[in-house]
């Protein structure tokens, strides 16, 4: 028995027998590939067509054919919706696998490029090209999107997203399951109307189409099917266990399932994913908080570094200003010529000096920089010419016998001379303030007249004792040490430098620097054989009557000034002021010319130096006085002969040098003078370099707490005064001390009450060099 399909679910309008649906709207159904269907099914017209959907009733075995129709296991005819039919055909077409294709398991399909899929493939099967509408239709038929890891919230979405959709009844190679895919409907359904009744009703009426019947059946059983799909996971797929969700955008009515049917399965997976997302967000927040903490620490450290750099810059600026003030003050105080700053730096480097007690005794502290071990194990002094050397004479404690020249060149003779000899130039240093000025007689006797031995003996301490014997004999030191000195040795003349230079003469002397000079002065009870051309009218009777009187007392200074016929105020004029003030220097020269020895030089009639060639060991009064009055290596000096043009500074020598000896040794004097000029230029260059270095880097100050005192006007020159101060150098006290001493010096220069300074800048001024040359020539002429 054959059943007419039009009678069962025919179209609402009558159609011609030859009409066929358009391939665009009604594609061939995939149900034609079912193996249970007959090979040549017949339609109502008795023709066979490949585009006809056929099926056979299980009870009769008679086939039926209709596009989009299928027969279920109960024998009921079901029509597959066109959307599902088109979708199955698109996914199964291998020509469009680049746009849509089945998954490997065949349970889902993929859309790799949604934009390209909607632009190229959707218009072929549908009347639109909107991919969002396609997704909404999939949601209406129960399809859901399978989430992927790359599409999660913890990763940025890629420009091209891979879409995967799945449905429990949409599988590859099983098109018969499409009849179980139903469309969702939110409209209330009639509970009394079932699929069979709707089909029967439509069959009875004869006017309802198959599409309407299927829609009615779907609306009547939508709620039951959804509940059945949820409760039976093996039959409809359990959403909670599969981790799949319904697709919806919230704009299409009916797209959201009822809350009482879908809320339960969707809560558990969403809760799990939200907890993971929350944990990830918490980790991100923790990391961000740690990064913010590190940034704050770095910012604080940066601010601390900038603050420290600023403070360091301020300290450096203050130090530079302090150093500039110190250097400016020192330059203003000492000037740029001579040995000013160089001597001060040398004294500051050593940090120690020589101090003399009030009773005349000297104490010299140990200086490691001035002593060096020689090959024999002995200590040999090395002394450097400078202002500090001119004030540091005095008796030493050396034990050597002869002074040794460090280098055979004349430069070494001018700069550095071995002072291992036991004879040295006495030091003239004030013991207190300017209340006890140093007289010229004492200065001359201590510097140019007599050379004290470093280890005095009691036998040579008398004021009238003599310490020299004949020139062609071997003299024995007054202290009885057995050190024989041959005064006729020509090599001794090489060490004869200017009395103003700081060198060590090589002649013995008595222990008292002023005693030999006092021996040649006429006393009322002295020997009548004593002859002296510049004999004053008994100027030293106080010394003869009271030998215990201090030699550096005001009485002795006045006596010496009276003996030389000099103005006492000139004795208090410093050498530095004489070199810097031409008027003071001229006044001093005029006073020397008017003195007793200056008049003796101008007269040319009185012998200044009787022949000292008397080998009498007892010592004639005349010869011993002359030898003692000279106080240096006087070898072979005959009768004095002068010229009309005699330098008045020769009056400082006692006895006066021989002019013929000076003339005979003019070549040596010129060479020494040229060497001195060369050394002076080198010293000036060195001074400029030191000044620039001091300006840029600062001064090397001592660490022992010694304060440096600069005494120019009181006879102390540039020296050091060591104190018990603390171990930290105070710059403010240092500047105040320098300023105070500078003011005192200026007052003394103005008032003329300062002491005679033993420190001079002879190397920086021509007058000083001239005195050095003359004195040196006098010493060499005697040899």
Swiss-Prot record:
Its main location: nucleus. Residues 350-372, 399-415 have a biased composition (Basic and acidic residues). InterPro entries: HSF_DNA-bd (IPR000232), WH-like_DNA-bd_sf (IPR036388), WH_DNA-bd_sf (IPR036390). Residues 11-23, 31-42, 189-199, 209-233, 452-467, 497-511, 522-550, 616-632 have a biased composition (Low complexity). Belongs to the HSF family. Homotrimer. Homotrimerization increases the affinity of HSF1 to DNA. Interacts with transcriptional coregulator SSA1 on chromatin. This is Heat shock transcription factor. It comes from Cryptococcus neoformans var. neoformans serotype D (strain JEC21 / ATCC MYA-565) (Filobasidiella neoformans). The gene is HSF1.
